[in-house]
């Protein structure tokens, strides 16, 4: 049975909050499609969009300023439920006749709100019970302004000692405002609040599921490319692997993948990619063995940025060479995902609704004259992983740690040589193997070895040896914007160190990186 998984959708208007993408993810986790657009979307665009409900997100501006962003008038005239969060609640109050003032006490961090009234939004939601029987909720606050007068027709929904109007509602119109952030995990009942809004008040069905997303994507790809041939650069990373599996299911032999083996991959990675896609799934994969070409161009180059540019440019040259050998290819497939779309639009214009028509990831030549097919461009990373599993990809492939585009080229400090790459490949493989054996691989967000181009003295038997240093790096993070070094057990680190020094010729010392981000970045270069 075919479902229109976009028919019921929640429109999220972004006023610049760092949490806006979290709102979209929370709605989708419930099983309903949501999309982020800029706050200045026109009234006609909103009416044409036909949302099932609208969420006004937070933002850094002050609604007390005359030039502050305002929600389009159509938001309140459309007749659909509206949820205002933080700044969204404040602009709702101002635009409907209420009042907002700067608060003498800024609230940032944990707070406890007291529920009031009989709103459908907070019905039966509580973390604790007050002495008078009122529901108390543990929430996350982040605001400097506060609503001091509710618009006519609104009732009090929540309060804190320093913010007497921390929530308001108009049940007849299904308008709700909360000063706190239900999208962050610190607000313990945030998911239930979104479920009440999306499933009950907006009356949406749970159609946004991995199986339905796959079905919808296959249908769209077939409509888009018809009987044309499609080319995909397969890296072995999560996004390109999921695109390969999805396109193969959609169009079969019309897909050709090019896998560029640059000599800077992890141990056995090239063989694993070929086994998975060419051997097991029957995907047509061309493997371009370009190790000597890449290492030749990198000889004598130590600057990290120059190394990146050489690796990126050489990849394009190899890919272009393979592409010109193929006949009648009209489409280029890419693993663009939704955060790429949002971020590139925001970077170009400051507005999330100007979606790029050509997301030229990796800087592929403009004169290649391919049309673009991007089957993941609506999806967040966690959704990409979910549909990867739905398509039958192995869990370890779908949930593998991130690997930089330049590969080991930026994990070898300074000049890249084959000797260094071979040593690093073995050290990295030992580290990851032991992490998996100790059940630590999926507890860390990213783990890898780094080759340091310095020699250190070591003692083996009766002899001294002067050899290379390997540093191990493992971090825990939610968003990769900040990260904490992983507190791995000493016994595990000792085992990894002993194996690397004993099993790899040319290594005399192993260190563990205990730097967090910031100030250090996750990768060394």
Swiss-Prot record:
Residues 9-207 form the Glutamine amidotransferase type-1 domain. Pathway: Purine metabolism; GMP biosynthesis; GMP from XMP (L-Gln route): step 1/1. It is an enzyme of class 6 (ligase). Pfam families: GATase, GMP_synt_C, NAD_synthase. GO terms for molecular function: ATP binding; GMP synthase activity. Its EC number is 6.3.5.2. It catalyses: XMP + L-glutamine + ATP + H2O = GMP + L-glutamate + AMP + diphosphate + 2 H(+). Residues 208-400 form the GMPS ATP-PPase domain. ATP binds at residues 235-241. GO terms for cellular component: cytosol. It comes from the Bacteria. The active site is at residues 86, 181, 183. Keywords: ATP-binding, Glutamine amidotransferase, GMP biosynthesis, Ligase, Nucleotide-binding, Purine biosynthesis. Homodimer. Catalyzes the synthesis of GMP from XMP. This is GMP synthase [glutamine-hydrolyzing]. The gene is guaA.
């Amino acid at each position: 049975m075919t479902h229109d998984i976009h028919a019921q959708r929640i429109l999220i208007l972004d006023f610049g909050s760092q949490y806006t993408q979290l709102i979209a993810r929370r709605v989708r986790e419930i099983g309903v499609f949501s999309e982020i657009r800029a706050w200045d979307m026109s009234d006609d665009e909103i009416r044409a969009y036909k949302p099932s409900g609208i969420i006004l997100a937070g933002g850094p501006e002050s609604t007390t300023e005359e030039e502050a962003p305002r929600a389009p008038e159509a938001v309140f005239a459309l007749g659909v439920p509206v949820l205002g969060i933080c700044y969204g609640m404040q602009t709702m109050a101002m635009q409907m006749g209420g009042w907002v003032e700067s608060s003498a006490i800024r609230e940032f961090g944990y707070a406890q709100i007291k529920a009031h009234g009989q709103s459908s939004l907070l019905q039966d939601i509580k973390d604790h019970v007050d002495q008078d029987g009122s529901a108390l909720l543990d929430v996350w606050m982040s605001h400097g302004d506060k609503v001091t007068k509710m618009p006519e027709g609104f009732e009090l929904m929540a309060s804190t000692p320093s913010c007497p109007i921390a929530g308001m509602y108009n049940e007849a119109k299904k308008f709700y405002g909360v000063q706190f952030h239900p999208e962050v995990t610190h607000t313990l009942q945030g998911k239930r609040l979104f479920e009440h809004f999306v499933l009950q008040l907006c009356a949406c069905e749970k159609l946004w599921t991995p199986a339905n997303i796959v079905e919808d994507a296959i249908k769209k790809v077939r409509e888009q490319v018809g009987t044309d041939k499609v080319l995909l650069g397969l890296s072995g990373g999560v996004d390109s692997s999921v695109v390969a599996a999805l396109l193969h299911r959609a169009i079969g032999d019309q897909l050709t993948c090019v896998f560029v083996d640059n000599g800077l991959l992890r141990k056995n990675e090239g063989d694993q990619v070929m086994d998975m896609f060419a051997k097991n799934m029957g995907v047509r994969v061309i493997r371009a063995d370009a190790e000597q070409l890449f290492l030749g161009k990198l000889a004598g180059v130590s600057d990290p940025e120059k190394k990146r540019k050489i690796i990126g440019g050489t990849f394009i040259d190899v890919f272009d060479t393979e592409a010109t050998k193929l006949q009648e290819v009209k489409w280029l497939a890419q693993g663009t995902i939704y955060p790429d779309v949002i971020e590139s639009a925001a970077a170009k214009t400051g507005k999330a609704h100007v979606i790029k028509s050509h997301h030229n990831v990796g800087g592929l030549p403009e004169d290649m004259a391919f049309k673009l097919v991007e089957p993941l461009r609506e999806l967040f990373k966690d959704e990409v992983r979910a549909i990867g599993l739905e398509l039958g990809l192995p869990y370890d492939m779908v949930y593998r740690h991130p690997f930089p585009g330049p590969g080991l080229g930026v994990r070898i400090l300074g000049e890249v040589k084959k000797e260094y790459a071979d040593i690093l490949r073995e050290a990295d493989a030992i580290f990851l193997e032991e992490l998996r054996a100790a059940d630590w691989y999926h507890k860390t967000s990213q783990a890898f070895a780094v080759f340091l181009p310095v020699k250190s003295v070591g003692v083996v038997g009766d002899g001294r040896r002067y050899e290379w240093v390997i540093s191990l790096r493992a971090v825990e993070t939610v968003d990769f914007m900040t990260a904490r070094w992983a507190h791995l057990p000493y016994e595990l680190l000792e085992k990894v160190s002993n194996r690397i020094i004993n099993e790899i010729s040319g290594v005399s010392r192993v260190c563990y990186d205990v730097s967090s981000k910031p100030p250090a970045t996750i990768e060394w270069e």
